[in-house]
Amino acid sequence: MMSINLNLIMAFLLALAGVLIYRSHLMSTLLCLEGMMLSLFILMALLISHFHMFSASMAPLILLVFSACEAGVGLALLVKTSSNYGNDYVQNLNLLQC
């Protein structure tokens, strides 16, 4: 169980490093954020089942719902910036004025 937790924490840290390194393109940032959310979901589900905390069994599902909402908003931003500017650079996001 300890090696699985270590692998999931390393996956989260690698996705976080991906967000920090590849932050020029929006698509790369969104993929890294999805990797972070997926590793958090699996880690949370494994820890809840390992420690038999079934009162908190809805927490991974709530995290998954927020992850889906984040993906939807991120893809909407990606479509908006790529249709307006023709690329997916993050630096174009502060040019969007609503």
Swiss-Prot record:
The keyword Cell wall biogenesis/degradation does not apply. It catalyses: a ubiquinone + NADH + 5 H(+)(in) = a ubiquinol + NAD(+) + 4 H(+)(out). It holds the Pfam family Oxidored_q2. One of its GO terms (molecular function) is NADH dehydrogenase (ubiquinone) activity. The gene is MT-ND4L. Keywords: Electron transport, Membrane, Mitochondrion, Mitochondrion inner membrane, NAD, Respiratory chain, Translocase, Transmembrane, Transmembrane helix, Transport, Ubiquinone. It comes from the Eukaryota. One of its GO terms (cellular component) is mitochondrial inner membrane. PANTHER family: NADH-UBIQUINONE OXIDOREDUCTASE CHAIN 4L, NADH-UBIQUINONE OXIDOREDUCTASE SUBUNIT ND4L. GO terms for biological process: ATP synthesis coupled electron transport. The lineage of its organism: Eukaryota, Metazoa, Chordata, Craniata, Vertebrata. Gene3D superfamilies: 1.10.287.3510. Its EC number is 7.1.1.2. It is found in: Mitochondrion inner membrane. This is NADH-ubiquinone oxidoreductase chain 4L. Core subunit of respiratory chain NADH dehydrogenase (Complex I) which is composed of 45 different subunits. Belongs to the complex I subunit 4L family.
